Amino acid sequence: MEQVTESRRKPIVVGIGELLWDMLPSGKKAGGAPINFVYHASCLGAEGYAISAVGDDELGKEIVDELDKNHIQHLIEKVPYPTGTVQVELREGIPTYTIHERVAWDHISPTSDAIDLAEKADAICFGTLAQRSRQSRETIQAISSFAPKDAYRLLDINLRQRYYDKELIE
């Protein structure tokens, strides 16, 4: 009897949004919910892609190197804004966050490569935080609209500072 094996393709998972450095008391750590999602999905066997923007600066170079080191595929634009950072302070063990504004991930553009990738996605993750700027909000909504109807859409709701409203969450 001939053995039949089924070849399964890896699911394609896309995270679009903030790529930033969390500036912790112990040092900096790469972060951003959609990119963290892609990292963990990739560790579980998915074909993961990060879509974001970084500045043409040392922090941008370092964070792209971090993605490469962790085998995270990416479509990262270099834009004329600083790479995103979040200052994290601990007060009596409780973290507080200062999320810096007018940074690279506030200026993500809907590239044709990103749209092509979204069309193949089995899951797409994005959040409210990266949609604080009009440009990134329109980009995230445009790119995610190209995902197949049956693709999972995961929304990270971030209720920090003033970067959300009822309309965005709905």
Residue ranges and their predicted role:
Residues 2-72, 86:
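Glycine-rich phosphate/adenosyl-contacting loop at the front of the ribokinase-like
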Residues 2-9, 113, 139-145, 168:
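Short amphipathic alpha-helices and their capping/turn segments at secondary-structure boundaries
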Residues 9-10, 119-120, 149:
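Residue-level preference for short coil/turn positions at secondary-structure junctions
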Residues 15, 76, 153-155:
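General beta-strand structural signal in soluble alpha/beta enzymes
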Residues 26-28, 100-107, 131-132, 158-164:
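Short, flexible loop segments at the rims of nucleotide/cofactor-binding pockets, characterized by
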Residues 27, 60-61, 111, 136-138, ...:
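Conserved strand-to-helix beginnings and helix N-cap segments that scaffold or border functional pockets
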Residues 47-128:
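Conserved N-terminal subdomain of the carbohydrate kinase-like
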Residues 123, 127-170:
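Conserved beta-alpha-beta core of the PfkB/ribokinase-like small-molecule kinase fold
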